[in-house]
Amino acid sequence: MFQSKISGLGFYVPDNVVTNDDLSKIIDTNDEWIQERTGIQERRHIVRGQDTTTSMGVKAAKIAIERSGISNDAIDFIVFATISPDYYFPGPGVELQKELGLKTIGALDIRNQCSGFVYALSVADQFIKTGMYKNILVVASEVQSLGLDMTTRGRSVSVIFGDGAGAVVLTRSDDDSGILSTHLHSEGEHAKELAVLAPGMGGRWITDILSENDPDAAVVFPYFWMLLKTWSSLKPNFF
């Protein structure tokens, strides 16, 4: 069995620095309160129109590939971890492939919240150990700032999170160096204690969800008219 190792690493954060003092102007908090609880002094937030989840991932990936010493053509798979994709679907993995000018290789998206990169790295590691791929680009990118409650009510969360991206190139190794093993666990019993419940299907029909929004806005749900027609014809067959 092969081993996998990190051959290149890159990261990107937006230019917009948000300090604890900046937050204290809009939230009932202060630098001492934040540092005492988190150790955080500043975080980065995107400026609308300048950065996206995909664009930050692209910038981090370019650095990782350059540092790995391999060419773009040597990348044979992508694993992209995020919970803040640019679109509901397709995921950012395929956008990354396009923007980097890579071959039409596979791109897998992973949504595992804070542990997303760990899961992405583990998946890539297993792909390499089985001999399926040789060089895998693993990317994690998040735009959290646009979904934060920037009021005193949300300060326990909003002072923690920022925006940015990281990337590694995971490469096959014939020696014992690299990732030894990974062990993943979950505890669904407490899932709803840290959850974002919307948007979500929640067992509803697509037509029910759309009725709560503006049906003229096709962006409410991708391929609106195609799905509406398909689901309308299928729905009676389920009863």
What does each of the following model-derived ranges do?
Residues 35-55, 83-136, 141:
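Conserved catalytic cysteine-centered active-site region
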Residues 77-83:
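Short glycine-rich or small-residue beta-strand-to-loop segments that form or flank ligand, phosphate
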